[in-house]
């Protein structure tokens, strides 16, 4: 019991990080020579981690989320090799087995593998989303795809309204694609100063020059 507690308090965190890093490198090798797909999962992983941390995910859920984000598109390669296509449904059908093989080889626990399989097998399914890991993975994938697919703002807005649930994900969308919502006018400083001067004059306040 004491040994188990020591593992939980100390080396467990280090072991988790090392395993995620090994999975990261394994996925880069898996897609060697294909920078497009490597950079896609790198961005999805980074945004998933950011949203997960900002939303306060616990350590175990974050672990699953990071692993799933790294391998979420692993089925693309299998689909292309088998059928010459890599649409969302093909990814969901072929991805889980490929993810299981890689995660098993790297020593991931069975419960983690099962959840990652589920997420990989549903990451293009946007109804009945169960769990923050699932929700965040979908949001991160959308954020990256919005840019990579060159979607117009109207399509982005509609899908965000239907799919996005986390406050962090929504904020990133707004800052990334709708900055005009937050930009102040070019003369905001002058306008604010004029308002202050008008107020001072109305109140009859004397300010020494």
Per-region residue spans from a language model:
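Divalent metal-dependent phosphate-bond-processing catalytic cores, especially two-metal-ion Mg2+/Mn2+ enzymes
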Residues: 2-14, 18, 32-42, 46-58, ...
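Active-site flanking loop/helix segments enriched in acidic
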Residues: 19-43, 75-86
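A generic alpha-helix surface/boundary motif
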Residues: 21, 45-46, 96-98, 114
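An active-site-proximal "capping" alpha-helix that borders the catalytic cofactor pocket
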Residues: 44, 89-105
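Acidic/histidine metal-binding catalytic segments
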Residues: 57-64, 106-120, 133
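His-Asp-centered metal-binding catalytic motifs of divalent-metal-dependent phosphohydrolases/nucleases
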Residues: 62-84, 95, 117-125, 141
